[in-house]
Amino acid sequence: MYPNKKAFKLSLFALLLIANLNAQESNETIKLQKVVVSTTGFEQDADSNLRNVISIEGKDLQNKGYVSLEQALERISGISFVNFGLGRNIDMRGQGDKSNIAVKVMIDGRSINVLDNSHGVTPLDSINLDNVERIEIIPGGGSVLYGSGTRGGVINIITKKQKSDAFAINLKSNAYNHGGLGGNLGINGAKQINENLAFSFDIQSFNLDGYQEGYNEKGYFINTKTYIDINDNSDLTLGYNYFKSKNTSSGYLTKAQAQSDPTQKGNSDNITQINRPEISLDYHYYFDDMWEFNLEAFWQNQKINYLKDEISMMRTTAYQNGSGFEDTLTGISLKNKLNYANNSYFIFGYEFANHDAKRKSLVYYSAAPIINYHRMTTLMDMTKQSHSIFALDSHNFNEFFTLSGGARYEFSTYNTDRSYRNEMSMNTRSPSPIIIDSTTLFDTDKNTNNFAFEITPNFKYSDTGNLYLKYERGFVSPTPAQFVNRNKTRNGTPPYYSSNLKAEIFDTFELGIDDFWWDFYGFNLTLFYTLSKDEISYLGNPHSTSGSWWKYYNIDQTRRLGVELSLSQNFLDDDLIFRESLTYLDSKISKGVNDGMRIPYVSKIKATAGLEYAWNKNFSNFIDLTYFSRAKDGGTIDENTGKMSQNSWIRDYFLTDIGMKYNYKKLQILAGIRNLFDKRYYTYQDSINDQYLVGNGRNYYVEFKYSF
């Protein structure tokens, strides 16, 4: 970045940060007050929460023309995205390459994280952004209510509930400087059949070209809900969602290619197809004003099939056509809330989850004249079944002091079945080729017991201000794939054996303040420290030419500390709105062979700033700035010791978005430019193997919405 451009953007950040001198009462896009969130599993006012929670209205994201949830969340305070070779995963509070198992993503309280952590990416693309009512972000923790995998935090995506008659259509178009047209077409509506029965739907289709040549996504979303008011005390919601897409990609670029022309085709040719159906049931019963009961049951399935997967390597081409993954989660949750005193409640419940993952890996190549063919087939069937009980009490002693505390117990059983078949034909000096055809089978079963608890005293020191302290002990359970190791030396011993892993245990200490000062701006600040023990580490090389081997084991300890700051101000009777945020993270390995090293893929600083100005009730503009500081890539890891080295810097970058919104009667028009200054940045970097993926350059959008 040229110095003058960087100075301009930093100056604009500074301007926005000090622009609260004459601000009026905040009614910001990112709200921490007077909104309804589900941090207890039951809807309540945000004022009743005892810790800092960010609630983002879906309409505020939809009004900025985003085409995906990932694109929208990337601009949100405290959230980053990490790609360590599998795809992009949401990261919070510096989880790095553990982000896919240490940040829990939910839809209406149902987890969508996949079970196969070694090859899994949380399926954000399957979420229809136009069907989002709001997004609740709970930084750091949540183990008592949500179980394993919340060290970084919880993101709960609440979908729309529309019962009254409505119908709307929307058309969205997107393009890059060099072309790459794409768009979305959708309809949504609702019909109230009678006073006790209603139905809503949202159908969106999309066909989007990527920034890089050879990238395309096309498919559709179907989201439906049926609402049944059984009587005055109970209601039932039945949901069905379906997502299907076909994605084409062309793989990585070298650094030289990325610098010369980041839009050019990569070194591979891949086509994947994704199918994801979901069924859910949500039942509420209100016994009286004191006791509320909630039953949730759901089933979700995701299949990823590699229709074409080719990569050029060492003067040959390897084919993985026919490979794929399947992830199925079935669950039930029984929750109760007792409001036993004024502003005091007790929540308790039981959860069951059966999570199954299947992996099919097919690799084929030939290298004439020596290798006629080499075909490797790996089949894995992994299951985790868990039973959990939990309780959380919040007691309001007086108008100044509230104490919250809770605990969770989780019992889990694991089963992993693995099959590996190796087929090879090699030419030698003998007249006939050598034929190898061997199959290795392995299975293992494990049981685990895990506990979590938290305590949070909250002090209301003024009419507008709250101060809280929180201690939480949580856990990140191993995944079934991590219970299987492979020997380095055979010598007649079985190639596979079970690993004796413990869950990762973390302790989080948090101090937060939320206030509304002098009647002109809101202030929110959080300080946290997280120490994680028994982190699961990895040794080996599954692709070694001398024989694949790997080992999962508990050894590492990490510590993460940080600061999260959010501000927002309004001017001119809410016509001019400013927003600012700053997140600072210091994430390091604090024990073991890599003691003192930074956790890869984690930026120390993320800053956001923005303004919105309404010229009148029908026309408004916005500008958003997002900054990520540099981070270390994965470097290389010694397969015998686990020592990291040669971790190169991933460059820092600014993103600048501008846009407008215009309303005319029932028509709404959105238009804007994302990455206005065409900043070049990497969404994936492997400097050792010279592999890079480039983020989207300057792109333009326009959208039309019409409500009948």
Please annotate each region the language model reported.
Residues 341, 396-403, 411-412, 522-533, ...:
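Gram-negative outer-membrane beta-barrel transporters
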Residues 168, 177-207, 211-250, 270-292, ...:
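Transmembrane beta-barrel wall of Gram-negative outer-membrane proteins
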Residues 32-64, 89, 223:
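N-terminal periplasmic "start-of-domain" segments of outer-membrane beta-barrel proteins
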Residues 320-338, 378, 386-390, 496-502, ...:
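Outer membrane beta-barrel strand-and-loop segments of large Gram-negative receptors
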Residues 190, 325, 393, 469, ...:
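Conserved C-terminal beta-signal and adjacent last beta-strands/turns
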Residues 110-139, 160:
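Short acidic/polar hinge/loop motifs at secondary-structure boundaries
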Residues 246, 252-260, 356-370, 413-438, ...:
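Surface-exposed extracellular loop regions of Gram-negative outer-membrane beta-barrel proteins
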Residues 70-111:
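Extracytoplasmic beta-strand/coil segments of soluble accessory domains associated
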